């Protein structure tokens, strides 16, 4: 059973090596050499260095990579365009942008293209690059584990139903119901509660996309019970709100317009917040897609918990019958 948000995920797992593959793109030979040397120290990383986006695309056509690390300013196709094309070719790819000329616009553009992290050169500590690559690999591994867990859970339920034909009818019906609910959540699990702080425009965009949305003030205790909280960088209390919600129930999405403060965006990246560039022509698509993805992940997790409980109950009913 393929999860709709993990198309192509993990297809290279059987390639005969436990190493992760990193595609490194920079047109400065010295920088490229330093980065390659740093990452090559990791025994479980295979690094492929190239000097242009065009060279990177050739490799992406023939090989599956786990992480793309690219400079923003490249000859020919730029880093932002490369990330967008690479993610189109390999949707499971994690992408990290590197630049010596950071700006709010470049951060927003990188994340809109599909980047999940951002590094400003020169590195204060060369280990930053290694840490960012490791974090990207962990994010990808978590998605693979979620996908594999979903498949295994559905397989177990189907096998148990077949093996436990003599189980009491109520137990059979309960497990079949939860299995159907689980499969439904995998296919269409993008329902849940969404709260927006400080952006009437975001409320409208999400409602137009058929989400149930409530607009709340930043101090509202209801925020902690929401599934997804959308907050705008223009809200003066966004730092406090983000820190309060970190580690709590909601997923936090930060809206950032072209006039967003660069330090705010870099702090949001440090806090591992989901960042959405707003005020762009494609904003009406990007925000609903991000919220839909987060709600789908949550819906699957909840359905998996219910199915686990139903499996345990069914096993107990079989044991009692025998």
Residue ranges and their predicted role:
Residues 26, 71, 99, 230-234:
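Active-site residues of response regulator receiver
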Residues 29-48, 200-216:
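Two-component/phosphorelay signaling modules centered on CheY-like receiver
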Residues 49-67, 214-228:
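Acidic, metal-coordinating helix/loop segments flanking the phosphotransfer/catalytic sites
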Residues 51-52, 78-81, 236-240:
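Acidic catalytic/metal-coordinating carboxylates
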Residues 98, 255-257:
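Hydrophobic/aromatic residues positioned on beta-strands within the core alpha/beta folds
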Residues 128-140, 146, 286-298:
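Receiver (REC) domain switch/output surface
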Residues 138-192, 296-322:
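CheY-like receiver
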């Amino acid at each position: 059973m393929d999860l709709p948000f993990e198309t192509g995920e993990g297809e290279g797992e059987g390639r005969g090596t436990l190493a992760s593959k990193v595609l490194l793109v920079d047109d400065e030979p010295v920088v490229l050499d330093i980065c390659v040397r740093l990452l090559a120290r990791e025994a479980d990383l295979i690094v492929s260095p190239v000097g242009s986006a065009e060279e990177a695309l050739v490799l992406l056509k023939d090989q599956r990579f786990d992480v793309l690390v690219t400079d923003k300013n490249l000859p020919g196709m730029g880093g932002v365009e490369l990330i967008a094309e690479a993610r189109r070719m390999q949707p499971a790819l994690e992408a990290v942008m590197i630049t010596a000329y950071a700006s709010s616009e470049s951060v927003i553009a990188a994340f809109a293209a599909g980047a999940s992290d951002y590094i400003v050169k020169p590195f204060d500590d060369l280990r930053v690059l290694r840490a960012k690559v490791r974090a990207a690999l962990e994010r990808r591994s978590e998605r693979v584990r979620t996908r594999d867990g979903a498949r295994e859970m559905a397989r177990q339920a189907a096998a148990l139903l077949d093996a436990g034909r003599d189980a009491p009818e109520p137990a059979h019906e309960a497990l079949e119901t939860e299995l159907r609910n689980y499969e439904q959540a995998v296919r269409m699990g993008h329902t849940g509660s969404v709260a927006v702080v400080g952006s009437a425009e975001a409320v409208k965009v999400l409602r137009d996309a058929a989400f149930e949305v409530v607009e709340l003030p930043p101090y509202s205790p209801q925020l902690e019970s929401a599934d997804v909280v959308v907050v705008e960088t223009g809200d003066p209390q966004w730092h406090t709100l983000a820190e309060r919600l970190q580690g709590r129930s909601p997923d936090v999405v930060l809206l950032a317009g072209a006039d967003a403060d660069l330090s705010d965006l870099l702090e949001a990246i440090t806090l591992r917040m989901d960042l959405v560039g707003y005020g762009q022509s494609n904003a009406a698509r990007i925000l609903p897609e991000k919220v839909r993805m987060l709600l789908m992940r949550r819906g699957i997790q909840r359905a998996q918990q219910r199915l686990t409980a139903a499996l345990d109950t069914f096993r107990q009913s079989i044991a009692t019958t025998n």
